Curated annotation (Swiss-Prot):
PANTHER family: IRON-SULFUR CLUSTER ASSEMBLY 2 HOMOLOG, MITOCHONDRIAL (PTHR43011:SF1). HAMAP family: Fe_S_insert_ErpA (MF_01380). Binds 1 iron-sulfur cluster per subunit. This is Putative iron-sulfur cluster insertion protein ErpA.
Length: 123
């Protein structure tokens, strides 16, 4: 009797470096339609400042730099520069509407502390 042994490597898929939610992409699409410029992309960045040391920023940009990380979703593009990307690995960029208002939200697993408003953090 012959026994056949097969080894199957069951590794988890690699972590997604950055999540751009459907809700955020849909809101960006709406904002781009209002602007009337199909060349615009949403740029997310991290800069020094805020009450916790770093703060998030959002802006529209027509230029995609060679070293930008580009995420495509729902026909819109999210851009992140390399310096900001290192602080955003594993983060989720979302858009929420609730009783507190409507805003883009970044859920960042790298942030060790955040301020009350959620726009600044430390690592």
């Amino acid at each position: 009797m012959n026994a056949i042994t097969e080894t199957v490597d069951l590794q988890a898929p690699p972590p997604v470096p950055l999540v751009f939610t459907d809700s955020a992409a849909a809101k960006v699409k709406d904002l781009l339609a209002e602007e009337g410029n199909p060349e615009l992309k949403l740029r997310v960045f991290v800069q020094g400042g805020g009450c916790s040391g770093f703060q998030y920023g959002f802006t529209f940009d027509e230029v995609v730099n060679e070293d930008d990380t580009v995420l495509d979703k729902e026909g819109v593009q999210l851009l992140v520069d390399p310096m900001s990307f290192q602080y955003l690995v594993g983060a989720e960029i979302d858009y929420k509407e609730d009783l507190e208002g409507a805003q883009f939200v970044i859920r960042n697993p790298n942030a060790t502390t955040t301020c009350g408003c959620g726009s600044s953090f430390s690592v």
